[in-house]
Amino acid sequence: MLKTIIFDLDDTLYSYSDLNEQGIKKICKFTCKRLSLKENEFYEAFNKAKKDVKEELGENVASHNRLLYCQKTLENLYKNPFSISLEMYEEYWTYILDNMKLNEGVLQLLEFCKKNKIKIGICTDLTVHIQHRKIRKLGIDKFIDAIVTS
């Protein structure tokens, strides 16, 4: 008898990839407007920032932190990294959280597991803070028995 099932969160229980792309576009629009930049200037700085953060930190949880990408983007643009990095970060996550939807059949599967006393775990990357926010926003926190994040 199955006792436990473990799921990834992003691109398993909900579709993350498209939201991520749109979230980055939201950051771009916000940053370009605030700093009078062209989109290509933003994307050049942002892509370099993401690459640099991953090279500097390796594959650990901090290397996924969008606030670091935003801060480094501003540094790459020779702007004060404290000027709007937090606002950029909030633009991104507000968009993601406001637009997430469970994939078809996920709620029914989680309900089935609970009804049949199957423990549910989440094993995922990104920071624990944002993963908790996502789980609550998706309304599935009542189903989850354990979470492991990177």
Regions found by a protein language model. Give the residues of each.
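Active-site neighborhood of HAD-like aspartate-dependent phosphohydrolases
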Residues: M1-F7, T12-A45
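Conserved functional loop/turn residues at catalytic and ligand-binding sites
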Residues: L13, K117, G139
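Substrate-recognition "cap/lid" segment bordering the active-site pocket of phosphatases
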Residues: D98-K101, G121, L126-S150
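Short, acidic loop-to-helix structural element flanking the phosphoryl-transfer center
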Residues: S63-L68, P81-I84, E90-I120
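Hydrophobic alpha-helical core bundles mediating ligand binding, dimerization, or RNAP-core interactions
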Residues: G23-C28, F46-K50, C70, Y89-W93, ...
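A metal-dependent, Asp-based hydrolase signature
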Residues: K48-E90
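Short helix-capping segments at alpha-helix termini
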Residues: K33-K38, L77-P81, G139-F143
